[in-house]
């Protein structure tokens, strides 16, 4: 029994890439739901990370996120992904309103030498839970998005990466003088993910 439970603590590069890419898929869904980018009724509830999570039922968005997480997993396994940014923009003007940053630090030794690390599934899940709870409570610290919005995803990779044809070069979609909130991090011992949301200052704040 002891050896069976110990084996669950072993993290491989491929396993870590799967954890991080899956996390981003659920995080993206949660952001789109909690920021009301898509209607509440277009999401369904599922259990994940010991929490009730929301997943889009919009076929276009589902396919986009599925394709995205598959590509992210490939880049993560190659040690080539530095950051993922989910950008929320005004549908009418394309003005950037929020940038959800997921900064990734990869253990180079694991990529180069195939080393394995140890960390319990429960510990990783607890760290991810903390981030998901912060995303779910974002209405308490982010301004209301009172206009129709759209989203995009930026991936920052090493310069030697050949991106698939579905990806195009993009500007950074920055926000002038943004407000920032640092969220929790999680670490598989191979990939460390730091989370930060930056957002456009509310007009009321600017008048004060």
Swiss-Prot record:
Keyword field: Cell cycle, Cell division, Mitosis, Nucleus
Gene: MAD2
Keyword Ribonucleoprotein: no
Cell location: Nucleus
Cross-referenced PANTHER family: MITOTIC SPINDLE ASSEMBLY CHECKPOINT PROTEIN MAD2, MITOTIC SPINDLE ASSEMBLY CHECKPOINT PROTEIN MAD2A
Gene3D superfamilies per UniProt: HORMA domain (3.30.900.10)
Any one GO cellular component localisation term in the record: kinetochore
Function of the protein: Required for the execution of the mitotic checkpoint which monitors the process of kinetochore-spindle attachment and delays the onset of anaphase when this process is not complete. It inhibits the activity of the anaphase promoting complex by sequestering CDC20 until all chromosomes are aligned at the metaphase plate.
Superkingdom of origin: Eukaryota
A Pfam family this chain is assigned to: HORMA
UniProt key word Cell division: yes
Chief localisation class: nucleus
Domain HORMA: 14-197
Biological process annotations from GO: cell division; mitotic spindle assembly checkpoint signaling
Protein name per UniProt: Mitotic spindle checkpoint protein MAD2
Family affiliation: Belongs to the MAD2 family.
């Amino acid at each position: 029994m002891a050896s069976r439970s110990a084996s669950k603590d072993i993290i491989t590069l491929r396993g870590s890439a799967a954890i991080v890419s899956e996390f981003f898929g659920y995080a993206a869904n949660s952001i789109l739901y909690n920021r009301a980018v898509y209607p509440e009724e277009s999401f369904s509830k599922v259990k994940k990370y010991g929490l009730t999570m929301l997943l889009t039922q919009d076929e276009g968005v589902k396919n986009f996120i599925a394709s995205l997480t598959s590509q992210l997993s490939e880049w993560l396994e190659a040690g080539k992904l530095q950051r993922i940014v989910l950008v929320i923009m005004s549908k009418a003007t394309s003005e950037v309103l929020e940038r959800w940053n997921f900064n990734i630090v990869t253990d180079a030794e694991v990529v180069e030498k195939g080393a394995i690390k140890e960390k319990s599934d429960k510990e990783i899940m607890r760290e991810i839970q903390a981030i998901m709870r912060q995303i779910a409570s974002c209405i308490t610290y982010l301004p209301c998005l009172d206009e129709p919005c759209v989203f995009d995803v930026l991936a920052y990779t090493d310069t030697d990466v050949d991106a698939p044809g579905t990806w195009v070069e993009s500007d950074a979609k920055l926000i002038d003088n943004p407000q920032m909130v640092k969220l929790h991090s999680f670490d598989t011992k191979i990939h460390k993910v730091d989370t930060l949301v930056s957002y456009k200052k509310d007009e009321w704040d600017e008048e004060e």
